[in-house]
């Protein structure tokens, strides 16, 4: 068994080793590229303060770039007996470069190293989420504009209420995504601060240049206080998880609507046959399994913040091994949410709408408020108009005029999709992805 970075003369018990490493080796594969990026920035800083020579820096950077390429191709592995990604990268360096590879850990702890890895990974995942949310938003706005004049029933308490439209329905979910990205932008700002240099949580006697690594990695700023930097472990993940849960909640509600509207009892929308699944016994079935699975997956994702809270909420300041378990629920959650976003975008692009829903007389009562308002506009007090229309309905005398004239902002006749789109573009523009991408590209390519 390979010696651990922290082992001295006593080898750890085998069962203890298995239990404490847990799933960390598997989870750390998510972080491999980012561990290498962090090491590139760290050793560049070490050279600037005299802990590495220029020649050593160039040799180490070249080898780290080779390791990065391996990780970027998905070929990075953590060997048997190696407990984490940090140990594997250092092992690969020392195999190739000897004692020079052992110098990269000066002024650094695995505590701030994994904090950095998690932040670099998370901000990259946030960029992917923002791009996918933007793609879904564009589809929803396009469908809203396309079907803006097609009416459908609006419901309260699952009872027929007032006229709505597909323009409103598609557009509502588009605007919901704007708010979801507002929350994600706040989470990104917390994520995009540099913890490197906090070491084990109490800094270092080396004259580390933390601003230099902040700039090299394209962070907005630092987690200044070294104790707080370590306290941020778990807090950052929880904050991002709440933002992910917001997106998941929007998708879950949309999926529920789609399942319901697609059913025979509603018949408001229709999915292409190739987007549905069948039954092993009922030959007529065309099931909206994609939306059902999206609903379940997104409901699960809404539990992610609570999982992280329960793992971390009773810990004092400083590092504790409990925090390792957060990786197991946090890191894979991004793939699940991204898959849901891709599939919902795919489905909503192809969904067909029923343009004649309100021809059915069972929806006549939708127009009761329209009739009340018409009488009010003719001079009748609202309460009198409300009572008269109610009595007409009870007596079976209500004959609706199936027309609507809603003109205020955000209504059937005035969707304000241009304003909603402007809000989305503003939110997306507030992320500093260009700075992040440029910094990482410079580290990778020199």
From Swiss-Prot:
Family: Belongs to the lyase 1 family. Argininosuccinate lyase subfamily.
InterPro entries: Argininosuccinate_lyase, Fumarase/histidase_N, Fumarate_lyase_CS, Fumarate_lyase_fam, Fumarate_lyase_N, L-Aspartase-like
Species the sequence originates in: Parabacteroides distasonis (strain ATCC 8503 / DSM 20701 / CIP 104284 / JCM 5825 / NCTC 11152)
Enzyme Commission number, as recorded: 4.3.2.1
UniProt protein name: Argininosuccinate lyase
Catalysis: reaction(s): 2-(N(omega)-L-arginino)succinate = fumarate + L-arginine
Domain of life: Bacteria
Predominant location category: cytoplasm
Name of the gene encoding the protein in the UniProt record: argH
One Pfam family from the record: Lyase_1
UniProt entry tagged with the keyword Amino-acid biosynthesis: yes
């Amino acid at each position: 068994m390979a010696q651990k970075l922290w082992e001295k003369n006593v080898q750890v018990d085998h069962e203890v080793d298995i239990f404490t490493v847990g799933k960390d080796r598997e989870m750390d594969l998510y972080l491999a590229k980012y561990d290498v990026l962090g090491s590139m920035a760290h050793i560049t800083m070490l050279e600037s303060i005299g802990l590495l020579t220029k020649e050593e820096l160039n040799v180490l950077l070249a080898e780290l770039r080779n390791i990065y390429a391996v990780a970027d191709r998905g070929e990075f592995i953590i060997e048997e007996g190696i407990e984490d990604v940090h140990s594997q990268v250092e092992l690969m360096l020392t195999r190739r470069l000897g004692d020079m590879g052992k110098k990269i850990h000066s002024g650094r702890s695995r505590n701030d190293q994994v904090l950095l890895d998690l932040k670099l990974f998370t901000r990259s995942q946030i960029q992917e989420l923002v791009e996918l949310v933007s793609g879904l938003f564009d589809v929803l706005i396009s469908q809203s504009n396309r079907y803006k004049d097609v009416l459908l029933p609006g419901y309260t308490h699952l009872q027929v209420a007032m006229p709505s439209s597909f323009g409103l329905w598609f557009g509502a979910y588009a605007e919901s995504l704007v708010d979801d990205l507002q929350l994600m932008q706040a989470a990104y700002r917390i994520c995009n601060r540099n913890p490197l240099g906090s070491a084990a949580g109490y800094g270092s006697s080396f004259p580390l240049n933390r601003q230099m690594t902040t700039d090299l990695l394209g962070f907005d700023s630092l987690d200044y206080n070294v104790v707080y930097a370590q306290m941020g472990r778990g807090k950052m993940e929880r904050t991002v998880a709440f933002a992910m849960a917001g997106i998941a909640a929007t998708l879950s509600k949309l999926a529920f609507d789609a399942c319901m509207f697609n059913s025979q009892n509603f018949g408001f929308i229709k999915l292409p046959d190739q987007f549905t699944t069948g039954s092993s016994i009922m030959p007529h079935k065309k099931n909206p399994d994609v939306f059902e699975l999206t609903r379940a997956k997104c409901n699960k994702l809404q539990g992610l913040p609570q999982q992280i809270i329960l793992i971390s909420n009773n810990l004092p300041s400083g590092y504790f091994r409990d925090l390792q378990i957060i990786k197991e629920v946090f890191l894979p959650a991004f793939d699940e949410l991204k898959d849901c976003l891709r599939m919902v975008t795919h489905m909503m692009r192809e969904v067909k709408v029923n343009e004649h829903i309100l021809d059915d007389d069972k929806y006549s009562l939708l127009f009761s408020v329209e009739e009340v308002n018409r009488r009010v506009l003719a001079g009748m007090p609202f309460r009198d108009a409300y009572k008269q229309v109610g009595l007409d309905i009870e007596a079976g005398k209500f004959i609706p005029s199936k027309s609507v004239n809603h003109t205020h902002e955000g209504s059937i006749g005035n969707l304000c999709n241009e304003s909603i789109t402007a809000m989305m573009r503003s939110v997306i523009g507030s992320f500093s992805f260009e700075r992040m991408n440029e910094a990482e590209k410079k580290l990778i390519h020199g």
